[in-house]
Design a protein with these regions (language model features):
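Acidic, Mg2+-coordinating catalytic modules of nucleic-acid enzymes
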Residues: 1-195
Length: 195
């Protein structure tokens, strides 16, 4: 369920969280996709990306969207430099300050909306997913002194070790998050683990 209404006169999108409608739609989809041993796990809100923007990963996702925009707009160099990362982080921080008075849901909508073009489509989804994965890996790795964040896409190449305490903390946050729980449960179910 899209968290907005469209003004019939101006065609402008007006935020409307629609919690009840989202909950009902999720329940219907889960029933629809559950059959025998196959079980449906669908997002509790509009899309996967919107749920991530609502979740404990919101700040990381917001930055990843800006990293993705920098990569998409870099015609010649499809990588992030420290300067571009700094600009993207600053852009995300500026927006976060501007959006402080908004509800979490409206902030998430604004973050997700950054990914969309005028037609409501996005060519950023795959890029943002890679950026988010790299940012989370960076966040949970033991980074040697002098290594800058532009290396976040090459952590395996450099053989950086994982900081197990940071990884465990992030795992706990993700597993407890109400907007990510459906993904965690789907993975556990597919792996034969108890959910």
């Amino acid at each position: 369920v899209k968290p907005y209404d469209t003004d019939s006169t101006t065609k402008e999108k007006v935020f409307n969280e629609k919690v009840t409608e989202s909950t009902e739609a999720e329940e219907k989809k889960n029933i629809k996709y559950t059959n025998g041993a196959v079980r449906g796990f669908t997002s509790p809100r509009w899309t996967l990306e919107y749920c991530i923007a609502l979740s404990c990963l919101s700040k990381d996702f917001h930055k990843a969207v800006h990293y993705g925009m920098k990569i998409l707009n870099a015609r010649e160099y499809i990588s992030l430099t420290d300067a571009k990362i700094g600009e993207a982080n600053k852009d995300a921080e500026t927006e976060a300050q501007l959006w402080e008075s908004l509800s979490d849901a409206e902030r998430a909508y604004r973050i997700y909306d950054l990914m969309l073009n005028g037609d409501g489509k996005s060519s950023l989804k795959a890029i943002v997913a890679q950026c988010l994965a790299s940012a989370l890996r960076w966040r949970t790795s033991k980074i040697p002194e002098g290594v800058t964040q532009e290396k976040m896409f090459d952590l395996d190449l450099y053989g950086f070790k994982t900081d197990e305490a940071k990884k465990a903390e992030l795992n706990t946050q993700i597993e407890k998050d109400q907007y990510l729980r459906y993904i965690v449960n789907a993975i556990k179910y597919a792996a034969g683990e108890e959910i």
